[in-house]
Amino acid sequence: MNTIWIAVGALALLGLVFGAILGYASRRFAVEDDPVVEKIDAILPQSQCGQCGYPGCRPYAEAVGLQGEKINRCAPGGEAVMLKIAELLNVEPQPCDGEEQQAAPVRMLAVIDENNCIGCTKCIQACPVDAIVGATRAMHTVMSDLCTGCNLCVDPCPTHCIELRPVNETPDSWKWDLNTIPVRIIPVEQHA
């Protein structure tokens, strides 16, 4: 019975010693993050789509905060994200498409040819916003409300049954921006 208590005590002592060493090391070798980069990263939509030319939202936030990259390259975030970053950095807002002369980008939507889909789930694994639903060896489909048109699901498909199609702007497909219409709350007087 004493050997069990000795073993338990030895393990507890080892846990305390290694915990203290890890605690000291985490404080001693801590890397300070730039608070501006953290704020920019919090503003970005975290879709990790790569449309900005960076592998994810965090590298793009670091490029904007530390290297002075353009603030208008986040396609899923659009103008709202660009304006928030411009306000945070106290810089002039830039056109969302990067150049004044270019036409506004057409919203694209991934469409799966369900007759040719073999249910391999490679597109589901590639989608950064979970816009594709389906199960193994079953038909997959794209939820159009969630799809950002990032093109990351097209290449992994072994049967090439996914294509990007432009979305026709109709009242049903339009993404309404609630900030475009100024809303004012009017106080109501209650009469007894």
Curated annotation (Swiss-Prot):
Q: Which domain of life is it from?
A: Bacteria
Q: What is this protein called?
A: Ion-translocating oxidoreductase complex subunit B
Localization of this protein: Cell inner membrane
Query: Could you tell me the Gene Ontology terms of the biological process aspect for this record?
Result: electron transport chain
Tell me the subunit arrangement: The complex is composed of six subunits: RsxA, RsxB, RsxC, RsxD, RsxE and RsxG.
- Region (Hydrophobic) spans which residues? 1-26
What range(s) does the 4Fe-4S ferredoxin-type domain occupy?
108-137, 138-167
Q: Which GO terms describe its molecular function?
A: 4 iron, 4 sulfur cluster binding; electron transfer activity; metal ion binding
Which InterPro entries does the entry link to? Answer: 4Fe-4S_dom (IPR007202), 4Fe4S_Fe-S-bd (IPR017896), 4Fe4S_Fe_S_CS (IPR017900), 4Fe4S_Ferredoxin_RnfB (IPR050395), Elect_transpt_cplx_RnfB/RsxB (IPR010207), RnfB/RsxB_Proteobac (IPR016463)
Where in the numbering of this chain does the 4Fe-4S domain appear? 32-91
The gene is: rsxB
**GO CC annotations, alphabetized:** plasma membrane
List the Pfam families: Fer4_21 (PF14697), FeS (PF04060)
Where is [4Fe-4S] cluster 1 annotated to bind? 49, 52, 57, 74
Q: Could you say which cofactors this protein requires?
A: [4Fe-4S] cluster
Per the similarity annotation, which family is this? Belongs to the 4Fe4S bacterial-type ferredoxin family. RnfB subfamily.
Q: What residues does [4Fe-4S] cluster 3 bind to?
A: 127, 147, 150, 153
Q: Does the keyword Protease apply?
A: no
Q: Does the keyword Signal apply?
A: no
